[in-house]
Amino acid sequence: MSNFSMETLKLLRQQTGVGLTKCKEALAECNGNLEEAVVYLRKLGLASASKKEHRETKEGVIAAKSDSRGTAVVEVNVETDFVANNAVFRTFVDGLVEDVLNHKVDNVDALLQLPSSQDASLTVDELRAVTMQTVGENIRINRIKYLPKTTNESVGIYSHGNGKTVSVTVLSGISDEESLAKDISMHIVAAQPLFLNKESVPEDALAREKEVISSQIQGKPQAVIDKIISGKLGTFFQDVCLLEQAFIKNPDITIQGLINEASKTRGNSVEVKEFILWKIGA
């Protein structure tokens, strides 16, 4: 039977901002004494971390990993670039990638409540608080992504600027071409496509582009206008659609052409299943 009331537990959580499990542990260790429990949590480096939660986080790092468990991408933000390159912070981020892969989780709130792979006695959120205490800055897990591992696919990851920008490319129909997938990921970081192909461009974005083009060519015959719009839309698609872009390592071929060559070599259909492009703060 617990030696503390629910009201005391509630007060401890309000005063410290620490998770339920650790608050229960603190009160149990301190025989239900609220003040001693606060001190107990402070010694663990948990209580004071909540005071940093309001601080703005514009810097950080994006980390990604792919293995037999799937593919994980995480973005974690801090206040300064100095801490973003701190070894303790980087270790915490690497641990988060492992947590996402181990638990196959795709939601930040759910991840925060799970046991940390770095310290099973702490939840991910509690370890975040401990790490905040160590580095002296607010830490915010901005977003995470988990992609399940499936058969006959290749995943390529490219990181630029020490984790400021990361791209992931998933190729289907090919199981041993991580180098090709990585080349495409490198291209994505350089060319910054917004969409996979023409078909994935939203109707509203396409309508806006047509409106902009039309406003520039008023007063011409409709047949001429239609031809100009078609040509300019082709340029638009080349700018924003991955498969329409000229390959950064060989501009004589598009990404779609590169995929077609891989399909021909393999004797089966190879496709870009999906891609991710994350930039810090974007």
Swiss-Prot record:
UniProt-listed SUPFAM superfamilies: Elongation factor Ts (EF-Ts), dimerisation domain (SSF54713), UBA-like (SSF46934)
InterPro entries according to UniProt: EF-Ts_dimer_sf (IPR036402), Transl_elong_EFTs/EF1B (IPR001816), Transl_elong_EFTs/EF1B_dimer (IPR014039), Transl_elong_Ts_CS (IPR018101), UBA-like_sf (IPR009060)
Keyword Lipid biosynthesis annotated: no
Gene Ontology terms, MF aspect: translation elongation factor activity
Involved in Mg(2+) ion dislocation from EF-Tu as annotated region, ranges: 80-83
GO cellular component: cytoplasm
Predominant localisation class: cytoplasm
Keywords: Cytoplasm, Elongation factor, Protein biosynthesis
Pfam families per the UniProt record, alphabetical: EF_TS
Keyword S-adenosyl-L-methionine recorded: no
Subcellular location: Cytoplasm
Family to which the UniProt record says this protein belongs: Belongs to the EF-Ts family.
Function description: Associates with the EF-Tu.GDP complex and induces the exchange of GDP to GTP. It remains bound to the aminoacyl-tRNA.EF-Tu.GTP complex up to the GTP hydrolysis stage on the ribosome.
Name of the protein in its database record: Elongation factor Ts
Source lineage: Bacteria, Pseudomonadati, Chlamydiota, Chlamydiia, Chlamydiales
